[in-house]
């Protein structure tokens, strides 16, 4: 069954020139790009996107980071797209949890600056896609 997920290449990934690498891995996995956009994230969108973390000690720094530079947002589609991209991304902590061969395992060094975001469930994907691409 085909599903959709939101993928973000965060400001650190854009700044380091890793957008092509991330997109290439998505396409080589057999997933399809449905929408793709380079944008500066506004505070309101950042707050809505990370609403589940509101009140946590790292919330402010998370918002500061995601709004610090351009982000590439994409809607990716394919069989098991959510879990397929999360496998490509690797664990949230690039050093302790991300497997070598994953995006974070190959290129990441810090938990907060972990290059990419992928929706973690069908419910999250639906909510996040509506936030980032309301026209879809």
UniProtKB/Swiss-Prot annotation:
Q: Which reaction does it catalyse?
A: a 2'-deoxyribonucleoside 5'-diphosphate + ATP = a 2'-deoxyribonucleoside 5'-triphosphate + ADP; a ribonucleoside 5'-diphosphate + ATP = a ribonucleoside 5'-triphosphate + ADP
Kindly provide the name given to this protein in its UniProt entry. Answer: Nucleoside diphosphate kinase
Family matches, as Pfam families: NDK (PF00334)
Keywords of this protein's UniProt record, alphabetized? Answer: ATP-binding, Cytoplasm, Kinase, Magnesium, Metal-binding, Nucleotide metabolism, Nucleotide-binding, Phosphoprotein, Transferase
Q: Which cofactors does it use?
A: Mg(2+)
What residues does ATP bind to?
Answer: 10, 58, 86, 92, 104, 114
Tell me the CDD domains matching this sequence.
Answer: NDPk_I
């Amino acid at each position: 069954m085909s599903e959709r997920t939101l993928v973000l290449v965060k400001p650190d990934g854009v700044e380091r020139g890793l957008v092509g690498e991330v997109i290439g891995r998505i396409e080589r996995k057999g997933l399809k790009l449905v929408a793709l956009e380079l944008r500066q994230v506004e505070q309101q969108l950042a707050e809505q996107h990370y609403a589940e973390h509101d009140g946590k000690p790292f919330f402010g720094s998370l918002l500061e980071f995601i709004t610090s530079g351009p982000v590439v947002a994409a809607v990716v589609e394919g069989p098991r797209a959510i879990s397929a991209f999360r496998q490509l991304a690797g664990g949230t902590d690039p050093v302790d949890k991300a497997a070598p061969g994953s995006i974070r395992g190959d290129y990441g060094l810090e938990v907060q600056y972990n290059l990419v975001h992928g929706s973690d469930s069908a419910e999250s994907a639906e909510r996040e896609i509506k936030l980032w691409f309301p026209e879809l």
